Amino acid sequence: MANKEYPLAKFRNIGIMAHIDAGKTTATERILFYTGKTHKIGETHEGGATMDWMEQEQERGITITSAATTCFWKDHQVNIIDTPGHVDFTVEVERSLRVLDGAVTILDAKSGVEPQTETVWRQADNYKVPRMVFINKMDKLGADFLMSVGTLRERLHANAVPLQLPIGAEDAFSGIIDLVKNDAVIYKDDLGTVMDETEIPEDMKEMAEEYRTMLLEAVAEVDEDIMMKYLEGEEISVEEIKTALRKGVLANKIVPVLCGSAYKNKGVQLLLDAIIEFMPSPLDIEDVKGTEPTTGEEMTRPADAKAPLAALAFKIATDPFIGKLAFTRIYSGTMKNGTYVFNSNKGKRERIGRLMKMHANHREEVEELKAGDLGAIIGLKDTTTGDTLCDDADPIILENMEFPEPVIDVSIEPKTKAGQEKMGIALAKLAEEDPTFRTYTNQETGQTIIAGMGELHLEIIVDRLIREFKVECNVGQPQVAYKETVRKHVKAEGKFVRQSGGRGQYGHCWIEMMPTEGEYEFENAIVGGSIPKEYIPAIDNGIQEASQSGIIAGYPVINFKVKLFDGSYHDVDSSEMAFKIAGSMAFKNAMSKADAVLLEPSMKVEVVVPEEYMGDVIGDINSRRGRIEGMTPRAGAEVIRAFVPLSEMFGYATTLRSKTQGRGNYVMQFDHYEEVPKSIQDKVIGERK
């Protein structure tokens, strides 16, 4: 079965995404069970789920890394990426979306759209990924299908169109009405493999009629032929509805909504059918865009195995037995075992050792990967996340991925002297796998600092150090990852001259430094050769190294641009080293004049509390320097949305529990960096000294 060749039109590359605990991994497990990939269904709460293969995931019952799996259903090849729902791991979601063609969002029928669903949905909007929604846990207490559909419209502004209605809810959930075919499916056994297709139950006919009309109106909006038929009262066939639905989904105009209970095995096969019917194949999406490495001109590559190779390494993982795996999406062309590919980001040729198709943590070796495939490559030494692999005769650089800055850091030290080197190697490997995890040495204290997206993120990193790399370490208290930036446009000089017998050192440069919104930029505006070309990168390096430790409190400096406009050199004494030091001196001089300020991470916080505690909770948020953005009622509770500095949120869970007698809960995620008030800045500087 697995070795059969599938045409591209029969490929589906989809992601499964959701808020934590909406039942995403369970749904993926059921899909693998029905498509014949696993013989025993894994349960998350037993710690046996196939997709969750890192030990930490099985213990915590959450998904941390997105596993990529290939399975087969009704003569189609479906590649599934299971993405984490915890806010600390948005990077995994971001990179999965970059390589998917479509996504299934899973909601908990009791809660509808939750904050992390919104985050993931916005990320999917950025990549224009067509989506469908599976409302899960219909068997749970408080399950409400129509409320959940309502939250899709209100909170995500999605054109949510139910294709199904549940028959019963909670314990009485027994089947599903199919509005497209206008019939019903009743489940007869616990495994969901025995089901009866019957007529719609009498007591639901009226409701089904009403929702089928809404479905027809939605497809008529995207298809003129159906619009004409609908207005003239003609019968519209099931095939016509499906064709129009597919068209609406691909254009991001319709979001089909299905329902079920993955845990009770209800609705999963219908979900698989819908993935095949409505999700895009690699041929349906736009040709992938990129740039020519030398000229920078825009190019595109079609989804065609005969076209030149263009592939994106979207995730690096380290396997204890085979070393480094590069998970890759092939957009065009073919990649063969044992051949060379060109990494256009690094400008290096790399040899492919072996090619794999992945099934959670089992692998199948293959001879080649073609356009549309998702697979893993073994043997690439220099490739990191976001790199493009192509033919050196036909180079292209695909659009890279952008990752957020880490917001929280802790100091870490090995328990033994011997562990120091081991820890350094392990941290470098982990940083290579995860672009939102950074590690650096604090220049003032000499401590090793690790930084990430949240406490859970760093906990899991430390856990992996102990388990995978056998490094025992002591970890400090979590600290806020402050940053520094500049507010003024200034000019500054850096001059490094040393004459002390023998060959001297000479480096001299003038720079302009200015604030920007985006990443660090370096512009070389030298004319007339006042500094030779070969020394320019050294100045850039000197500035970048110096920017790791700002002048206010030694935090990394962000959001600035440097323009190198003048300088001088010495025929004999100038060297790269001298210019690197001159660059760092110019940076420090510029910073001291540029009105430097401290920045802190501001978090987007959502608190759900019963109405009677609202006053207390809002008062507490204000006392934490929070800015209330708005409030919305939700089923007997209020949702308070606010921006609060991360430094004020440590220990918030305990406070919220005591203020609401355990009935309040909250989620937060990083939103942006903003300036720290002067009084707080002085306090932070005092604590650093």
Curated annotation (Swiss-Prot):
GO terms for cellular component: cytoplasm. The keyword Nucleotide-binding applies. It comes from the Bacteria. One of its GO terms (biological process) is ribosome disassembly. Residues 9-283 form the tr-type G domain. GO terms for molecular function: GTP binding; GTPase activity; translation elongation factor activity. Belongs to the TRAFAC class translation factor GTPase superfamily. Classic translation factor GTPase family. EF-G/EF-2 subfamily. This is Elongation factor G. The gene is fusA.
